[in-house]
Amino acid sequence: MKKGLLTGLLLFGIFFGAGNLIFPPALGVSSGQNFWPAIFGFVVSGVGIAIVTLIVGTLNPNGYGAEMDEKISPLFSTVYLVLLYLSIGPLFAIPRTAATAFDIGVAPVVSESSLPWLLIFTTIYFVCAFLLAVNPTKILDSVGKILTPMFAILIVVLVILGIMKFNNAGTAAPTYETTSLAFGTGFIEGYQTLDALASVAFCIIAMSALKQLGFKDKKEYLYSVWIAGIVTGIGFSILYIGLGLLGNKFAVPAEVIANAKINKGAFVLSESTRAIFGNYGSIFLGVMVILTCFTTTVGLIVATSEFFNKKFPQLSYKTYTIIFTLVGFGIANIGLQDVIKFSVPMLLFLYPITIALVLIVIINKYVALSKLGMQLTMCVVTLISIVTVIGSTFKVEAINNVIAKLPLAAESLAWLLPTIVCLVISTVLPNRQKGKVYDFNEL
């Protein structure tokens, strides 16, 4: 049980980030009286899929890249991982952490014309992040280990007091009017945590850290990992539901709801903290968010630069850190809401592929599948993802009408049934074989 708890703390540290905290309260605001199906969809994708992805990834010492090389193709693996690292790195996650730090930590205390302040803040922020990323030290890890529990405790206290204090109770008109639409919207919002994508990238790091706890055999290792996953999942579910309720109960002014440039989650966090703890509490929250986001930013610059340097060694590690720092800086200055908006198409594309990949890896551990069938599965889910993104991004009614006719489309799972059908076909096509099961010494 002790090792399970330690493992749970490790998993919590991997997933916990200040950026994730803005989405549940924003969902609470927009869902109105359809809060519960919306937050359930968010928890399923934001917590459940992420933890299952991480745990399954710890069963292969070479991670998902090796699984894709073997089951699909090396080219597919490379393209997918490049897009994934760009998403959890300079295109979305890195600028989002910087923009979140500004929106919660700085924007509430500066003038309404925040553009020059955003530029000044991100310049200082990314210069410091670059200096640490070029020469990563263990000091940052130590700071993270101190900040994470402090920040988590602050958020828990804020949620409990906020739910007791505020009584708006979902009076805002919901953006989506049916239970299916509420679940589907929550499910897509859960993509924004980026945790499932991060699990694909960081499962090898997690496995290495887990092994240091000294498990005596594979059974104890797997038992502890699953227990930790369940405990972590429950913990994050409670945290997300609490933050969602905070947003649902907090009275957000109509002009804020109508302003597309204001992030509703950041607004709820900063204003509810001010209402409960006063100005000093708001300043404390801001400092915590800035520091937590900063440690995340440095970690993402390091991880992304290391991946690209290993995959494409023509450029040095330092060159990649310069490139990704500059890209993150540039995108962060368009503002938090626009960063989130621009990330949606890529997430709508990557998440179904990621979930299908995890399903293939899990099923293939127990059932012999054809390589041709697995390739067919990934082709189908990739095609549906591309078509869905084109239809939703460019408002192509003909495409949207076709997608809407697929089963589970209202729940944003139009790709799921075709994926399952292809996996069933994989069980009858020739040249089937089970995936390799590694013994404990190989893990």
Indicate where each model-derived feature is located.
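Hydrophobic, membrane-embedded alpha-helices of multi-pass small-molecule transporters
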Residues: 8-16, 86, 161-168, 177-243, ...
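Selective recognition of specific alpha-helical transmembrane segments in multi-pass small-molecule
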Residues: 48, 52, 150-162, 225-251, ...
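Membrane-water interface regions at transmembrane-helix termini and the short interhelical loops
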Residues: 59-63, 67, 125-147, 212-215, ...
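TM-loop-TM module centered on a large, flexible mid-protein loop between adjacent transmembrane helices
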Residues: 64-70, 239-294, 345
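Hydrophobic alpha-helical segments and their helix-loop junctions in multi-pass secondary transporters
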Residues: 90, 94, 152-178, 196-197, ...
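Membrane-interface loop-to-helix entry segments
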Residues: 133-162, 343-355, 374-382
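Hydrophobic, small-residue-rich membrane helices and short re-entrant helix-turn-helix hairpins
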Residues: 135-146, 183, 206-235, 254-260, ...
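A generic transmembrane alpha-helix motif of multi-pass inner-membrane proteins
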Residues: 165, 370, 374-443
